[in-house]
Amino acid sequence: MSELKDCPLQFHDFKSVDHLKVCPRYTAVLARSEDDGIGIEELDTLQLELETLLSSASRRLRVLEAETQILTDWQDKKGDRRFLKLGRDHELGAPPKHGKPKKQKLEGKAGHGPGPGPGRPKSKNLQPKIQEYEFTDDPIDVPRIPKNDAPNRFWASVEPYCADITSEEVRTLEELLKPPEDEAEHYKIPPLGKHYSQRWAQEDLLEEQKDGARAAAVADKKKGLMGPLTELDTKDVDALLKKSEAQHEQPEDGCPFGALTQRLLQALVEENIISPMEDSPIPDMSGKESGADGASTSPRNQNKPFSVPHTKSLESRIKEELIAQGLLESEDRPAEDSEDEVLAELRKRQAELKALSAHNRTKKHDLLRLAKEEVSRQELRQRVRMADNEVMDAFRKIMAARQKKRTPTKKEKDQAWKTLKERESILKLLDG
């Protein structure tokens, strides 16, 4: 029982952390399923709660380590004391058992006369041994609370926005104000290319020609004639396309009038919807008349195209007249002026880009002006700090002179007044 009373253990009572109160977000996340996951807005709260749990766990761990160290030291000290006790009994009980120490005592008395007793040197020799086994109780290490680094991280993130403006930052602003070399490239409108139908027709024709050339090459290989692939040139493709367009422009009925003339006549002639020509009765012609007209309406004459002179000039004249009246747009206008949805949207975005660039340039000019003003103020604030140091030095000199019970010299007073006036002038410049 005495050993238990002498035990230095404190038996700390560890209080468990209430997760529902201290860590509600952590408890809610644990209660979720794996499919729900964790949101980005919850990470900061989770970090703080996990730091709280880590600090409490480390606190308990340090207290347990301290208790373990105390118990180990106590056991070592207890064993050393038992060893010391046995050593003392052995040293004190050894002289009566052996005869040699008595002879040494007699020789010492006969040779040296009265002197210090024989037991005193032994006591001197035992004292250092006792000092070797002396132990001092180490104080219990109080567990240190882990350092909260959140304020330091916060001020480190805020410092760049509150620090003094440097000359490099001003130089960066000046470089940003320089117009970029490729600024004009953003406002160029690319020329209008070929229509997609023409481009696709050209690509399809090229593809067909390549396939035909490959098929011909395969046939030549079968016959034993090895020849290179013949690819159609782009100019040949354009010539073929123009030829096909010219062929398609000619109507099947062989009408010599142009497309514009036909459209104009179709717009002017009223169509008889009630009685179409297919249902209209065909009048009977007499045999003579039919015989006379038979030569003109023979099948051989129907295949020949109907020829009318000056159809091209008529087509161009009608076109000019319609353009003059404003009923038809001129095709001589450059392609850049042709308005379409893509061009309108492109010009709209270019106008927005110009307005935004002008706004940004204005703000950069204002920012550069404010930065230069702030740099000059920083220099004044630096001069104020230097003036404050000079004023404090003059004040210390005057106070040292008063402590020594001597009046300050005229030089010291003049220096103090001079530094004060300089400081006031700098403050006026800073406030102005």
Swiss-Prot record:
Tissue and organ distribution: Ubiquitously expressed.
Cited Pfam families: Ada3
Principal localisation: nucleus
Any Gene Ontology biological process: regulation of DNA-templated transcription
Modification type Phosphoserine: residues: S280, S298
Any one of the GO CC terms: ATAC complex
Protein name as annotated: Transcriptional adapter 3
Organism of provenance: Homo sapiens
Classification of source organism: Eukaryota, Metazoa, Chordata, Craniata, Vertebrata
Gene transcribed to yield this protein: TADA3
